[in-house]
């Protein structure tokens, strides 16, 4: 695909979850499908007709095994935050239908224990997970998502 063709593609609607524990640390998972250190917060597509908040709670459950009853939604981003994939990834992901993702983010407070987290889900996304100080998030994320993570941190700053 040429850069011009990619620029004409839409963004995939997606939600992201910033899950914080009682110490103010943020859940990140190491992606299973990446050989390099590619940590990220839980995220995933919004199904047609699905409410974004419901999608965020579903994605949290699907990717971390966290029961939605243990996650309190504290805030959400006002806007949808887009990011573009690197050109070489566009044809490999989502059958080349999207240039990247447009994400609605939710800050959730985790009211469970570490033992309530189970990344060995039906369709595992992560090979390992950890709690990370919010200040260390951006440097641990793949470069093409860093601007979105900066915007998410800015949006939720009053709650961190």
UniProtKB/Swiss-Prot annotation:
InterPro entries: Nudix_hydrolase (IPR020476), NUDIX_hydrolase-like_dom_sf (IPR015797), NUDIX_hydrolase_CS (IPR020084), NUDIX_hydrolase_dom (IPR000086), RppH (IPR022927)
Residue ranges annotated for the Nudix hydrolase domain, each copy included: 10-154
Pfam families listed in its UniProt record: NUDIX (PF00293)
CC cofactor: a divalent metal cation
Keyword flag Hydrolase: yes
Catalytic EC class: hydrolase
Gene3D superfamilies xref list: Nucleoside Triphosphate Pyrophosphohydrolase
Motif (Nudix box): 44-65
EC number: 3.6.1.-
GO BP terms, alphabetized: nucleoside phosphate metabolic process; ribose phosphate metabolic process
Keywords, alphabetical: Hydrolase
One Gene Ontology term of the molecular function aspect: bis(5'-adenosyl)-pentaphosphatase activity
NCBIfam families for this protein: PRK00714.1-3, PRK00714.1-4, PRK00714.1-5
Function recorded in the entry: Accelerates the degradation of transcripts by removing pyrophosphate from the 5'-end of triphosphorylated RNA, leading to a more labile monophosphorylated state that can stimulate subsequent ribonuclease cleavage.
Protein family: Belongs to the Nudix hydrolase family. RppH subfamily.
Name the UniProt record assigns to this protein: RNA pyrophosphohydrolase
Organism: Roseobacter denitrificans (strain ATCC 33942 / OCh 114) (Erythrobacter sp. (strain OCh 114))
The organism's taxonomic lineage, starting at the top: Bacteria, Pseudomonadati, Pseudomonadota, Alphaproteobacteria, Rhodobacterales
Gene designation per UniProt: rppH
């Amino acid at each position: 695909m040429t850069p011009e063709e990619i620029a004409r593609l839409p963004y995939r609607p997606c939600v992201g979850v910033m899950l914080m524990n009682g110490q103010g640390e943020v859940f990140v998972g190491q992606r299973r499908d990446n050989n390099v250190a590619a940590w990220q917060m839980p995220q995933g597509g919004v199904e047609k007709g699905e409410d974004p908040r419901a999608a965020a709670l579903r994605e949290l459950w699907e990717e971390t095994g966290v029961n939605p009853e243990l996650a309190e939604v504290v805030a959400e981003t006002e806007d949808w935050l887009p990011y573009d994939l690197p050109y070489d990834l566009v044809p490999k992901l989502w059958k080349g239908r999207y240039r990247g993702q447009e994400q609605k983010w939710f800050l959730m407070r985790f009211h469970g224990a570490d033992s309530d987290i189970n990344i060995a889900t039906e369709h595992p996304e992560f090979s390992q997970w950890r709690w990370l100080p919010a200040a260390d998030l951006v440097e641990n994320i793949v470069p093409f998502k860093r601007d979105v993570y900066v915007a998410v941190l800015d949006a939720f700053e009053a709650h961190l």
